[in-house]
Structures are given as C-alpha cells and as structure tokens.
Amino acid sequence: MRIAYIALKGMPLGGGIENLTEQVGSRLVERGHEVIVYCSPQYNIRPGKYKGMDIKILPAINTKNLHKISLVFFSTLHLLIKEKVDIAHFHAVGPSIFSFLPRLKGIKTVVQIHGLEWKRPKWGIIGKTFFMLSDYSAAYFPHKVTAVSRVLKEYYEQKFGINVHYIPTGINEINSRVPNKILEYGLNKDTYILFACRLVPDKGAHYLINAFNELKTDKKLVIAGDAAYADNYINSLKQKANKNTLFLGLVTGELLEELFSNAYLYVLPSEIEGLSISLLEAMNYGNCVLVSDIPENLEALNGHGYTFANKDTKDLQRMLRLLLERKDLVDDKKESAKKHVLENYHWDKIVDMYEELYSSMLK
C-alpha cells in the first residue's frame, strides 16, 4: 500500500500527532508499505527520507488561524496533482473539510479524530463554529473514521449515526534513564513534579501553577513544553509561577526521557483531551500520575493513578499535598501504571489495527 498522512508540523518533532505518525508510518515502512508525510515549512524540517518515510514540505500561511488549514489544503492539492496513493489519512477534525477531494480521484480516505476541537478555549466564536461544522465533514466526507479514545468513538457514533473505529495512540517499551542531563537544572531523582505538554490553556498548566504556589514543599515544579502563537499565555504562566518552578521550553530526546524517568509525580490538569500521549508516556516510565477527571483521562488511567476535579485548583492542591506527604500512595501506582499501558497501548498492536483497517478499504 501507498499511504499519505496530511498534515503535521514535521519529523522528528515532539507532539502527539507527530509522534503517532512517526511510530505508525515507520512501522508500516518496515512492513513493506510506502508512506508519504506532509509537513509544515515553519519548523526547519528537511524534505527527503526519514525512517523510510518520504517527508514533503508544503507551504502554509503562517498565522494562528490559517496555518494548519492552509497546510492541509496545499498538501491535498499536491497529493492530487503529483502523487499516486491508495490511502489518504487526514489528522484531526479541521482538516477533514478537504477529505472529500481525494475521493474524486478514487483514493480511499481516513479521518482520525484526536479530540473535540470546538471545546478548546483558545478558539473564539468563529473558530468554535468552524470546528463544530467540521464535525460533520469528519463524519461524512471520508470512507472511514477513527478515534483515539472510546469516549470520542461513542460521541461521534451517537451524534452522527456512523461507525467509528477505535484506534488509540500508543507507546514503546522503554528503559528508564538515570539522572544526567537534568542535573544541570538542579534536578535529581524524585525532586520534582513534572508537567510535559503543549502550553495552551486547555492543557491546564495555570491550574497546576496556582495550586503549586500554595504548597510548602522543597520539590520543584518542572514545566516542559511550548506552543506556537501562545506567547501571551506562556508569559502569564511565567508571571504567576514562583521561584521553584522551572520552564524548560520544548524538550525532546534524552532530556525528556530523563525527566519522565526521574519525576516524583506527573500531573496533567487538562480541560479537554483525545488521548494524551504525554500521559501514556508518563505511565510507561513507571510514574505515579495525577490527572483531571475528564472522561478521556479516566479512560486512559483505568484506575492506575489519581484524579482531581477538573478545573478545580483547590482540589488539585489537596491531592498534591496528599501525594507529597504520602510517598507510599505514589509508589503504589507506579508498576501497575506501566503494566497497564504496555498491555493496552503498545505501538505494535496499534499498527496492526491501522494495517488491518487500510487493507480492508482496498478489498
């Protein structure tokens, strides 16, 4: 099969969609398939081969509201004019508005739903309206629809009366790293609480910073993440944070692996999710995790961690204080969290599901 993924920031880069495409695409190449990945020009990514995948850089309008949708448009045009593929795989609800175009050339299309975009607080009324309408294109334009969580699958099936294929994101089996690079930041094993996500409002870093500020602890709070077009929000976080909070920006590679390997506690206070790869990775490294009690997080957690009431800083503060005082509660969840994600979210299992779906569409 020849499969095209439309569209993402680039490879290799951090980020949920980027990691998913890299893990799935590279494994499909190993199984004898050809993979094209359309990427943005804004992230200094080189065109050419990466892990056997053909990376193509297409133009995009570099503004918050038009960047992604223009990238998808130009990528789809390139696909129709320059390439011959069997499957066109569109990432996320917004890009689905162009998923009917490959069908005009007889190309099978898939739209993968990563979350309810219209719920994200960063969008104004125009953006929310666009994404609410895009739900319809995601449901009705492609040949097949997939969702990264059972919560999303049930939502779209009930709302639109369609069949949605549940295919989650995944993780690899890993070996934890001993402290090395993190020592340069004054960090060591069990000396910090970790937040590792994009710094956008719906990920909830502001709840965590506000709660952490009220605690009396010698542990640090490490904020590992960044986001495009979010300077005002990021600056507001830095202004709120106390001296025990470290902002490391976008972190990848060995440093990120060390941060996951040595954290005392991982916290995800997100208001909305599809299925958080960062959460799965934290559990995969054997971390105790504390997450907001939204349905998508509860699904991923499945009892192998702790929760607090969504958007409730006081409840988050209460749980942080409890887990800082009770290391036995922290230690109690570590191994079960790791075992849970390896049994249910391993990438090899996920790629089997994609390969089976793609093959069924060509019969």
Name the predicted role of every residue range.
Residues 271:
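Aromatic "clamp/platform" in nucleotide-sugar-dependent glycosyltransferases that forms part
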Residues 77, 128-145, 237:
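Membrane-proximal helix-turn-helix segments that form the acceptor-binding/catalytic region
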